[in-house]
Structures are given as structure tokens and as C-alpha cells.
């Protein structure tokens, strides 16, 4: 089990309360698909992903990005039980979707970039450290079924 300090919890929940889930989720997923184009193979049903412009304008990318970040919000609400919070999603991504678990880490790193861009003044080194810890824990929880 992960130990969260009171300060880490406050930093994470404080910033999360300001996050526009639709915009940041869409941007994070779009960046993942652009920066790591091999991840596009998991989204073949999304239509045109042929260029950064197409990806950024794709409504299915936007909708799924919001869904992903909404799910990430479940981690913020359940910091002391992230493993169980993501048990079903881990099973889905492993057994049905066959997603490489490394992609969870990549998306977490992208989310850090997006949050830093949107909250530059508030995204202090302490804030980054807390969020980096959170995305690592979420990525590990999502990869749990693979082990």
C-alpha cells in the first residue's frame, strides 16, 4: 500500500479541483497519440488519426480523453485504495484490449506535462512530485493484472 502524506493529499486534491477534465483529458490523450504514434493501434475505431491536426480535432479522441481523465479522478477520490479502484480497468486493458502496460506510464508522463502547462505557477516541484507519485501508482494499478 502506498503512503500519502497529508501534504501530498492536499496538493493532489487541491489541483484536481481546478482541472477541466474534458480539456485536459482530450489534450493528454491527443498528445499520447501524437508523441507515441504506435499507441494509435489501440484506437483504430476512432477514425482519422493521420496527423496531429486530425488527432486534435477528432471528437472520439476528445470524448475518450475525458473518459480517461474522469477515471483518473477516481484515483484522486480513492488515494488509499487505488489498486482496487482500478482492478476492473486493469482486467479490461489486459484481457480484452491487450494494451501494453508501458502505455499507462507514458500517459501518466503526458498528464504531468499537460498539468504543468495548464497550471504553471501552481505546478511547483512539490506539486510535480506528488502528481508524479500518483501517476506511477495509477500506472502500477492498471498494470496489476499483467503480473
From Swiss-Prot:
Provide a GO biological process annotation.
oxygen transport
Gene3D superfamilies under this entry?
Globins
Which ranges carry the Globin domain?
3-147
InterPro entries linked to this entry = Globin, Globin-like_sf, Globin/Proto, Hemoglobin_b, Hemoglobin_oxygen_transport
Q: Which UniProt keywords apply?
A: Heme, Iron, Metal-binding, Oxygen transport, Transport
General function of this protein: Involved in oxygen transport from the lung to the various peripheral tissues. The beta chain is a component of adult hemoglobin A and D.
* Family affiliation: Belongs to the globin family.
The protein depicted here goes by the name Hemoglobin subunit beta
- The organism named in the record is Aythya fuligula (Tufted duck)
Amino acid at each position: 500500500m502506498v503512503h500519502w502524506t497529508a501534504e501530498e493529499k492536499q496538493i493532489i486534491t487541491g489541483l484536481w479541483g481546478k482541472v477541466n477534465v474534458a480539456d485536459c483529458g482530450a489534450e493528454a490523450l491527443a498528445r499520447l497519440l501524437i508523441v507515441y504514434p504506435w499507441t494509435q493501434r489501440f484506437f483504430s475505431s476512432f477514425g482519422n488519426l493521420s496527423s496531429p491536426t486530425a488527432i486534435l480535432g477528432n471528437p472520439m479522441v476528445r470524448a475518450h480523453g475525458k473518459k480517461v481523465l474522469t477515471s483518473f479522478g477516481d484515483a484522486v477520490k480513492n488515494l488509499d485504495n487505488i489498486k482496487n479502484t482500478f482492478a476492473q480497468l486493469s482486467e479490461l486493458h489486459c484481457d480484452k484490449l491487450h494494451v501494453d502496460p508501458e502505455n499507462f506510464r507514458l500517459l501518466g508522463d503526458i498528464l504531468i506535462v499537460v498539468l504543468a502547462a495548464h497550471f504553471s505557477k501552481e505546478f511547483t516541484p512539490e506539486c510535480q512530485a506528488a502528481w508524479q507519485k500518483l501517476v506511477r501508482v495509477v500506472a502500477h494499478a492498471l498494470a496489476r493484472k499483467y503480473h
